[in-house]
From Swiss-Prot:
Record-given protein name: Cytochrome c-555
Post-translational modification note: Binds 1 heme group per subunit.
InterPro entries the UniProt entry points to: Cyt_c-like_dom_sf
Protein keywords: Cell membrane, Electron transport, Heme, Iron, Membrane, Metal-binding, Transport
Binding positions for heme per the UniProt entry: C7, C10, H11, M25
Cross-referenced SUPFAM superfamilies: Cytochrome c
Amino acid sequence: ALEASGCLNCHGTDLTGXPAXPATMPPGMFKGSNQQLKALSEFIHGLSAK
């Protein structure tokens, strides 16, 4: 679960120009669902912010 969260978080930052995520989870997998991915990323960031 932690690896999945870290990967989503990584790709979330990638959407804003951040570094790419790990190669084990290519951004292409999320093509067409960036909005959902962004929501998940923001949710994860919210948890880590607290």
